[in-house]
A protein has these predicted regions:
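Glycan-recognition and catalytic cores of secretory/periplasmic carbohydrate-active enzymes
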Residues: 1-202
Length: 202
């Protein structure tokens, strides 16, 4: 919000606010390449907006003119995206599906840091599918990659490895998955059946 407010008003107070938030995000990146969440031990993961930290930093870079701050922010983007690619290649992953670092909780006790596919839901009331998370990571890979992994000749203008990652998430959504189901309602084949409780989708 601070980035957009500065973009519209050009008021210095919003640039300062955007810088503060960018500094906070840059400071939350660990040496391993994941972002610290609400305490010093829990990695950031999200059922919908897994790519938001990178997307927000890319947007912020468009208004920042301080060279040192820009370089630090670009480094954050690069390290985070490099970590995502490394995470994906640590295990057999025929669909190149995005993996993540997370901590689960049971009976008030946090687990050790884990790496896996899909968002863990534990036993709480949260329910969230993976589709938005994968789309968010695709956006982060493409927008962030144009800054940190640029390749003018590559797909999406980014290097082949990151482009393959981005495309693989969309491929999964469109039906290149073990279920051969297109997750985008009305497109592809074998769409999940329409649930009356979902209301009108057409």
């Amino acid at each position: 919000a601070a980035t957009e407010l500065f973009r519209i008003t050009k008021k210095t107070k919003y640039l300062k606010a955007a810088r503060k938030r960018a500094h906070n995000l840059n400071s939350r990146l660990t040496a391993q390449g994941w972002f610290v969440s609400d305490n010093a031990e829990r990695p950031f993961y999200h059922g919908v907006e897994a790519g938001l930290p990178i997307i927000a930093l890319v947007d912020y870079l468009a208004i920042e003119r301080n060279r040192n701050i820009k370089e630090k922010t670009k480094r954050t983007i690069k390290v985070s995206l490099d970590n995502q690619i490394a995470l994906n290649t640590q295990v057999t992953n025929p669909f190149n599906l995005a993996r993540q670092t997370f901590v689960s909780e049971k009976d008030g006790q946090a687990s050790k840091i884990q790496e896996s596919f899909f968002t863990p839901h534990d036993e709480n009331v949260m329910w969230q599918g993976e589709n938005a998370r994968l789309a968010s990571l695709t956006a982060a890979a493409i927008y962030g990659g144009k800054i940190s992994h640029k390749d003018p000749q590559g797909a999406f203008g980014i290097n082949p490895e990151l482009a393959s990652f981005a495309q693989s998430q969309i491929d999964w959504l469109m039906g290149k998955n073990p279920y051969q189901i297109s997750m985008l309602y009305g497109f592809g084949v074998n769409n999940p059946p329409h649930a009356r409780s979902a209301g009108t989708m057409s």
